[in-house]
Amino acid sequence: MAVKRSTRLGCNDCREINYLTFKNVKKNPEKLALNKFCSRCRKVVVHKEVKRK
C-alpha cells in the first residue's frame, strides 16, 4: 500500500507557501521542485517542498 503524505510547496524567490500537494514517500524520498505560478511574485518560478513544522 502506498504511503502518501501531504506536502507544502513554497516559492523559491519570496518564500510564500502557495500550493499543497500529495507525494508518495516510498517511491520519491527526495524533495519536490515544480515550476508553478506565484501570486505574490506574479510570475512562474520554482516551488520547492517546505519542511513540515
Curated annotation (Swiss-Prot):
Pfam families the record matches: Ribosomal_L33
Highest taxon of the lineage: Bacteria
Keyword Ribosomal protein applies: yes
Signal peptide range: none
Keyword vocabulary terms for this entry: Ribonucleoprotein, Ribosomal protein
InterPro entries, A to Z: Ribosomal_bL33, Ribosomal_bL33_CS, Ribosomal_bL33_sf, Ribosomal_zn-bd
Cysteine-cysteine disulfides: none
SUPFAM superfamilies reported in the protein's UniProt record: Zn-binding ribosomal proteins
Example GO biological process: translation
GO cellular component: cytoplasm; ribonucleoprotein complex; ribosome
PROSITE patterns in alphabetical order: RIBOSOMAL_L33
GO MF assignments: structural constituent of ribosome
Family: Belongs to the bacterial ribosomal protein bL33 family.
The protein's name in its UniProt record: Large ribosomal subunit protein bL33A
Organism listed in the record: Mycoplasma pneumoniae (strain ATCC 29342 / M129 / Subtype 1)
Gene name, Swiss-Prot/TrEMBL: rpmG1
